Amino acid sequence: MGEIKNTAPTSDISTSGFIYFAVVFLIIIVYLFFKNILFLFFFKRYPKNTPKIGVSNITTIAMIIAVAVSVVLVLMALAGGLTAALFRGYPGFRVTLELILVKISGLLFGPIIGIFSAATIDFLTVIFSGGVFNIGYVLGAILTGMIAGILREVLISTSFLNNKTLSDFAYLVLSVGMVFASFLVTQFFVISVTQNLSAFQSNDQIVLRFNASPLNFSISLQRYVQIIFYFAMVVIITMVVLYFVWIIKQKHFNYAYSKFFFRRYKHANHQFTLFVLTKENWFYLILNVITLATTSLLMINIAFIPIFDTQTTGQTYDFWLLVRLLFAPLIFLLDIIVIYPILLLLTPIMLKGFKTVASETQTKGIKKSFSDMQSLIMPNVISHKKQQLIRKEMQQLAKTIRIDLSDKEVDALVEEFKEITKSFNKVTKIDTTNVQPMYAPFEFSPTPLRKDKPVVDKHAKQLLNNCCEVKTGFVKV
């Protein structure tokens, strides 16, 4: 039975890390290159991989860098020197905290800004905390920023698809592909480095040993890889389940081409109400966070960082592999808990970047994203309460937002808006003559929001007679 022995010098381990960085970096560059070629071929445009430089974007990047550095400094101050000693003795823990906000920067602003912010965060943290500088940790942060930026590129790429249902499915497939690819890369690299560091024979079984009193245990390399595989499969299954929940929840409540979201429900005061929702984006946010947390955990925290932990601490490579595996659930949950609410708050910045990328090569007067399709259509829908939008208008509106649609897609788009306008027409025809206008809670509602009595407007009769011309924009009250 073979056991890992650190017979190879530390320089050999770091060489493996540099090779790993070079290979992953090259793969990302090749991906971006071919993606740009495909966009030129299919969409007749060249997408930028960085957002438009402006005061707001620069301020946000600087804020993320400052917050990442301050988190480390605050922890050092609160722990009374304990955290400082931990970060200096085991700098890999400091890097793990840094990487959380590096991911946010890359996801918001793309791989190029992700590289810059990652290197800046690591340098500043080392300077202000007095920690140990290691080029491997800088490279790990850079890879994390690039991986997060690739996720942003994937989301932008799928948003160019005309059919929303196809766009959602394409994003799921690409996200699942990234998770599975990260597992394959991690498996290959961990096995290769471990075999190189051990007196490996083809018939031997490599054993990883953890010796840190009072906890001592060992695990075979094969079992180690199986645990990583099971984790990746659980994540993939979770992503697929979320996709089906998204599809079921949106069933009969969305249009594939116009990308309208609406919801109908019965109420005592009227037959039904149609809501147009433009912020139903929880699926993309959750999938973003899960994919990013999984890929960075496997490719960076498990496959890459342990190499340089060995350099800075003197512990064996198998020791750090097992330490990272033990802390993997905590790191994964911490990523989701921290990144998701931050992305929820910064989503407008992210969507602003999508608008810039999606419209940069369009005419100068038109800078709209797919979400702006709704803001263009809504005034037309309201103004055509008793008319159907004609085909020519649909074509013009579609061309202002996206690439030219095929005749079949234009026909589908026209049919969708015919149905939408019919829904509005039904609302305008509702007879509310005998319905008393009031503020919430509704007097006849089966589930009132409050128990207090409704307040009736002084000019109720006038409101009833002019319920279709309310200046606030509502069709009916």
Swiss-Prot record:
Looking at the record's lineage, which domain of life comes first? Bacteria
Q: Where are the transmembrane segments?
A: 23-43, 61-81, 108-128, 131-151, 171-191, 228-248, 285-305, 326-346
Q: Which SUPFAM superfamilies does the UniProt record give?
A: Glu-tRNAGln amidotransferase C subunit
Keyword presence, Cell membrane: yes
The record describes its membrane topology as:
Multi-pass membrane protein
| GO CC annotation | plasma membrane
Stored Gene3D superfamilies: 1.10.1760.20
Please give the chief subcellular localization of this protein: membrane
Q: Which UniProt keywords apply?
A: Cell membrane, Membrane, Transmembrane, Transmembrane helix
One of its Pfam families is: GatC
Q: Which Gene Ontology biological process is one annotated for this entry?
A: glutaminyl-tRNAGln biosynthesis via transamidation
Keyword Cell membrane among record annotations: yes
Its subcellular locations are: Cell membrane
Under the heading PANTHER family, the entry gives: GLUTAMYL-TRNA(GLN) AMIDOTRANSFERASE SUBUNIT C, MITOCHONDRIAL
Would you identify the family this protein belongs to, as annotated? In the C-terminal section; belongs to the GatC family.
Protein name per UniProt: Uncharacterized protein MG098
Q: Which organism is it from?
A: Mycoplasma genitalium (strain ATCC 33530 / DSM 19775 / NCTC 10195 / G37)
